[in-house]
């Protein structure tokens, strides 16, 4: 019974699901009447989404279609970091959205502070792009999971390797 229980807090985006959502969004854009004759497109370049359209209004519509498809495929949209709208070739506008993979140092500190404020007997350890939480009591780990889920973090977090 002296064995410690642990879990990892991670922030991941499943790239195959993102690709599927992009394909479905592109089909909808091709079939929608308000996009007929427009140069709207969505591309995935490594971990950056590139949205292109005729003007900012249509770009916002492309973004709305993409977000709806990402939500349906359970891809966390909190992990999308949108850049500025910029002019592209051929009278089009472009916007880049970076997929944030992993927990950066600032968010790891926020998670660490949330856990420390609970004053439970748990240990936290920041490992590269994840946070490991260890405790003797599984009830304490469940309380930590509930607290981190209810916290308003700028990224979406998942809990894996619960042992």
Swiss-Prot record:
Protein species of origin: Bacillus cereus (strain G9842)
Entry annotated with the keyword Nucleotide-binding: yes
NCBIfam families: PRK05412.1
Alphabetized GO MF terms: nucleotide binding
Key words, A-Z: Nucleotide-binding
InterPro entries: DUF520, UPF0234-like_C, UPF0234_N, YajQ-like_sf
Pfam families given in the database record: DUF520
High-level lineage: Bacteria, Bacillati, Bacillota, Bacilli, Bacillales
UniProt-recorded name of the protein: Nucleotide-binding protein BCG9842_B4128
CDD domains: YajQ_like
Family of the protein in this entry: Belongs to the YajQ family.
Job description of the protein: Nucleotide-binding protein.
Keyword Electron transport: no
One annotated Gene Ontology cellular component of this protein: cytosol
